[in-house]
Structures are given as structure tokens and as C-alpha cells.
């Protein structure tokens, strides 16, 4: 039995050494070390040996098995290394070649416009305030001089969640909340950007959800001339230094007096074209002096403090600035549309 084990070892080691592929090595492993292999058969015949020979033959069989297994492992490692070298030699990489370009996204045009407006007002000493999109009826209407049953509420059909809770129809509630934090002491100088919601039918110029930026200044001795000067500066910064503005009388429950603000058409320079519908002017926002009732409900004495407020639709500003003819383009996630603003 001892000679048979040594003979099996010699045959196995010679075959392993001569093996030229991983498959051949695996076949040798199965042939000699498998459950039906000769070494296993030898171990099964140990019972026929005497009690004295059994330990000696058992130890020898295990040594032979271990040497064959080690030889197979070494051969596998060597063949795997050679196989990898051949694979790398056939797949040479030229590291001097330029890499594949990485697709780079662009900021959304609404983000570009919002950041531009925020930077403009921050440079004028304003701070940016935000508030909840799900608002109470009090802050969305009553605190803005729109009591229950007020006819002006029909101007903004709303998405109500409960009887006293709704999706805000404007960012004006942020102004009231901020004034309350000041506890009747000025100055207050803020802008408040954010989403607003109204029950409009979606079309080229209307959306049930859109972005709005409102501004508020409250301090002593604030006048209409302060509002006009601010809006003139904004128009020139946003649409060009040669722009002029005009104020038209209007009505908003939370301001008195109230105005609509137009800017000279940036396409025709005020001469009249299709963009301005031949008028030479384009409406950009609404504004006015803060109504005394709004100041009073927010904790300010209207005899001591005055203020002005303004609000603009971000989509409208972006449409005018970039010549976009349909508000729905902003929300369709069409990469062909958004990619045009990569450089913006």
C-alpha cells in the first residue's frame, strides 16, 4: 500500500506539472482527490490493515493527499497569473488617449432667475425668508386684509385641505410671519421666494403651481418714491440699463395705493412689437404701499411705520428674459429644453 501511494503521488505530480490549462488541473484534482479517486480508495481500504500499520499508512496517505493538493494550488496560481498576463497583453490601454466626455447638466432656468433676483436684492440689503407652503386661512387671507366673505377672495381660487388649511396662493404670508417676529419694531427688509398654488387651468400662460418672489420693506418714513426707485433699479438690473418703468393704478387688498408695474419692451425698445403687443410696454409685477390694516394685524403702528411690497411671478420673468412662449416648458423635464441653459 505504501508503494501504491508513492506511485499515485508521482503520477499526480507529473500530470500537474505538465498541465497547460486550468481545466486540465481541475480534471487532475477530481481524478486523484475526488470521492471516487484512487487515494480515497486507499483510505477506504485501511480497515484491512493491522492495528500497527493503520496509523502509519493513514499518516502517509494524508501527506500524499496534502502534497498533491498543494501542487494543484500552486499550478492554479501560476496558470491564472499567465492567463492574466496574456489577457492584459491583448488589451493594452493607451493612457494618453483623451477620456470620454462626462455629460454635464445645467441649472433649471427658474433656478437661474431666482438666484439672479436673490443676488440682486441681497446686494441691496435684503434678507431671504421662507415659509410653509401649506398655510392657514388666517395667514393666507385674513392677515392680508382679506376677511372671510371678502369678494376679493374670488380672485384666487384655492386648493383647500381643510376648512382652515390650504395650499398658499401667494408668498405674502411669509411677510406677515416675518413682521410678527419683529414685534412691531422696524426695519423689515425681506424677499420671500417659493412655490404657490392656484386652481388655474394649465395652458401656455397659466399653471396650477408656479414660483413667486415677493418683497417687503417696513420702516419709518417709507414712501411711494422709495418703491419706485427700488423697482427702477430692479428693472435695469434684470432687463438692461436703458429700461424704464411706469406705474399704473390697480387694486390689491393688502396694499393702498396699488400699482401694476410695466417695463419698456426689451425687444423693440418701446416702439411696439409682437412681444409687447404694439404697446411698447410689458407688465412685470404688482406692487403698492402696505395697507395700514396689514401693518396693524402684524403688530406695527401704521402711524409710525409705513412699508411697500411687490410681487412677481418667476416664470413670467424667465419667459420674458429668455423668450419662452409656453409656461409648461418649465415643468415637462424635457432635457432638450433645459440643456439650452447650461451656460446660464
Swiss-Prot record:
<keyword id="KW-0547">Nucleotide-binding</keyword>
<keyword id="KW-0067">ATP-binding</keyword>
<comment type="similarity">
    <text>Belongs to the class-II aminoacyl-tRNA synthetase family. Phe-tRNA synthetase alpha subunit type 1 subfamily.</text>
</comment>
<keyword id="KW-0030">Aminoacyl-tRNA synthetase</keyword>
<comment type="subunit">
    <text>Tetramer of two alpha and two beta subunits.</text>
</comment>
<feature type="binding site">
    <location>
        <position position="256"/>
    </location>
    <ligand>
        <name>Mg(2+)</name>
    </ligand>
</feature>
<dbReference type="GO" id="GO:0000049">
    <property type="term" value="F:tRNA binding"/>
</dbReference>
<keyword id="KW-0479">Metal-binding</keyword>
<dbReference type="GO" id="GO:0140096">
    <property type="term" value="F:catalytic activity, acting on a protein"/>
</dbReference>
<dbReference type="GO" id="GO:0005524">
    <property type="term" value="F:ATP binding"/>
</dbReference>
<keyword id="KW-0648">Protein biosynthesis</keyword>
<keyword id="KW-0963">Cytoplasm</keyword>
<dbReference type="GO" id="GO:0006432">
    <property type="term" value="P:phenylalanyl-tRNA aminoacylation"/>
</dbReference>
<dbReference type="InterPro" id="IPR002319">
    <property type="entry name" value="Phenylalanyl-tRNA_Synthase"/>
</dbReference>
<protein>
    <recommendedName>
        <fullName>Phenylalanine--tRNA ligase alpha subunit</fullName>
        <ecNumber>6.1.1.20</ecNumber>
    </recommendedName>
</protein>
<dbReference type="InterPro" id="IPR006195">
    <property type="entry name" value="aa-tRNA-synth_II"/>
</dbReference>
<dbReference type="GO" id="GO:0005737">
    <property type="term" value="C:cytoplasm"/>
</dbReference>
<keyword id="KW-0436">Ligase</keyword>
<dbReference type="Pfam" id="PF02912">
    <property type="entry name" value="Phe_tRNA-synt_N"/>
</dbReference>
<dbReference type="InterPro" id="IPR004529">
    <property type="entry name" value="Phe-tRNA-synth_IIc_asu"/>
</dbReference>
<dbReference type="InterPro" id="IPR004188">
    <property type="entry name" value="Phe-tRNA_ligase_II_N"/>
</dbReference>
<dbReference type="GO" id="GO:0016740">
    <property type="term" value="F:transferase activity"/>
</dbReference>
<keyword id="KW-0460">Magnesium</keyword>
<dbReference type="InterPro" id="IPR022911">
    <property type="entry name" value="Phe_tRNA_ligase_alpha1_bac"/>
</dbReference>
<dbReference type="GO" id="GO:0004826">
    <property type="term" value="F:phenylalanine-tRNA ligase activity"/>
</dbReference>
<dbReference type="InterPro" id="IPR010978">
    <property type="entry name" value="tRNA-bd_arm"/>
</dbReference>
<dbReference type="GO" id="GO:0000287">
    <property type="term" value="F:magnesium ion binding"/>
</dbReference>
<dbReference type="InterPro" id="IPR045864">
    <property type="entry name" value="aa-tRNA-synth_II/BPL/LPL"/>
</dbReference>
<dbReference type="Pfam" id="PF01409">
    <property type="entry name" value="tRNA-synt_2d"/>
</dbReference>
